[in-house]
């Protein structure tokens, strides 16, 4: 709104502020409420389910309005942030008693989903990330910031496919993109995508701002000096963070250069299919993290989630973690550490709030307790001989001076906010103690003064009192007023009484009337000074928090290794993946019966397993457990297997199950083929590929053809491949592809009921047991019986299975006798011959047809 002259002074003030934030809800402080006006009010009333009303008129129109009590702000903010909304907080900074016109107000902070830091607005076990993008279809610069921890990273990524996979991994709640980008690009379809002015991404300005933030001459020390696109994106994030926080950001101390080549890459589909930290229903139960996360602190849980979503290919780091877990298992040392780590709490986010200068009293109390627990924890860490654990111990340190300061300053159980005082201990500051004593002991002072004055004057009817209009006074009946001492100054005449004040009472009044407000102001000033002291130690404290989080994760993995019977995998140079008695870490915990462990062997002689067997036989579980074992090995964890020997992999692909993409206009089969295409384009001889039922979403012939060709291609790529299928024709692949072998999940039938044995055995399955599974699922008996009739007719009418290549050698497992779908297709020449009407043909036509038929052979 540009013309404000027709509005009231208060609404003019409102619109001047609102016009600076047109796309965000504005909470406008008025007394004890935050008021919300105009379109913001209509939107907020609907989102928050609060009453929409009207407040007078301005510019000739009534003002739509709703409001919330100031002390209930956090609950409403949490709801709005969860809905993806951003909120501008506008506070009164002027004094209503001295203001002429509207009380002065200003925006003090902006709450957005990606920049919240308040504990009540965050999921303590999840990173809250904001990202920014710059680039074109060939190369992108990506910057990622977690304002609640200070983690700040950049990378450059080639192509949309890799970029979208990385966005799926980090899952930012906000994504900033330049406003001059074309509309409807893939990145903009993500929830939380917001456009920013192109100059926010200016690379020169970004470089200058980042160097200023980190107090460096250039960015070479961070290894990202030449990543100009990523630097532009990082500059945008820094600007956005400062704009929303309205304060310096001392907890942002460095920039980390991440490289895709350092990690095992998982695309979005693979991440979802493996249910690492989110299950297929969108929840957290029965995920890998739900099984292996018993961390004592929330900051360690977040670190473990990052490890799971970014497995490493750095052998040195992985072996250091393995050595650390062994050390912690030795003598069950983790059992001593874990209770001590629990005392540390989530100091990572506490320190971030201190850096943002919005830490609350209970944050400081928790930091006090954490620092107090450090010496005992350090003593325990000193006994850990593993080199990596020794490095973590050296980083952690102790902070006796800060611990002592917080112990002297903060009461044992402080209130939630500093607003009403009562946070600092008695004895911390003499002036504050005096002010509080005046305020708290005013009643006793008046009683004592009255007793002293009665004794001094001999006037038994003398009273000391107070009212809001005239303040403190000494009251005497009119008859005794003439006997008042000379230092009594007349203040008020009443019917039947006179009121006086003395220099002593006046001095007390001046102190008492302002003591409470002065005490609050003094306590707030001391609290802010305490925050500044902590900020000056922020760098080593943050390093300690990071080290303690990693120690917690490693202790957790040691505990899980013991209680889940996990063993240390061995990385080797020879390309291989050998698993002895492997188990699915999640399914094993859910089952009420013992899990059937299975072996797997892939190396230079066998790169692909064709897996056949009945539905529910365990094919998908076998494939998923393989991927999870490989992934756990690549975070440095022990794995659910008796033994495991593997080489480093570069990517993990899964094509397991599909659902349609209605919003994107893609059918189930289209989604399946898109995932398959991604695998065939990007898999290498270092990739692990899981393919489950490829081709089932289309006609039988098309599906089999695609599955066969995809399997051949993967065999030629030499990728480590597990290929589950119900197309038994594929079991002849080992005859033409020497790197392919057959295995099957066994089952048996007893009294016409199927029994799944879940053992993986060499060779192809003998039958699919499809009707038995259908019966087990509760398909009506008449339907099952009719299906048996159809099956019998189909089996007798199809041509016998023909071998695709030369006969197998004696003793080798045989492919099941099943009709060859390709063999059962009529030859075009036979099909055409069957349609001829020989009686209507002339000799010449017959000769021409013979030539045509010959050409078809």
Swiss-Prot record:
Stretches the record annotates as Disordered: 795-823
Matches recorded under NCBIfam families: mutS1, PRK05399.1
InterPro entries reported for this sequence: DNA_mismatch_repair_MutS (IPR005748), DNA_mismatch_repair_MutS-lik_N (IPR007695), DNA_mismatch_repair_MutS/MSH (IPR017261), DNA_mismatch_repair_MutS_C (IPR000432), DNA_mismatch_repair_MutS_clamp (IPR007861), DNA_mismatch_repair_MutS_core (IPR007696), DNA_mismatch_repair_MutS_N (IPR016151), DNA_mismatch_repair_MutS_sf (IPR036187)
GO molecular function, one term: ATP-dependent DNA damage sensor activity
Keyword Transferase: no
Name of this protein: DNA mismatch repair protein MutS
The entry's keywords: ATP-binding, DNA damage, DNA repair, DNA-binding, Nucleotide-binding
Pfam families referenced in this protein's UniProt entry, alphabetically: MutS_I (PF01624), MutS_II (PF05188), MutS_III (PF05192), MutS_IV (PF05190), MutS_V (PF00488)
PANTHER family: DNA MISMATCH REPAIR PROTEIN MSH1, MITOCHONDRIAL, DNA MISMATCH REPAIR PROTEIN MUTS FAMILY MEMBER
Function: This protein is involved in the repair of mismatches in DNA. It is possible that it carries out the mismatch recognition step. This protein has a weak ATPase activity.
Entry binding sites for ATP: 613-620
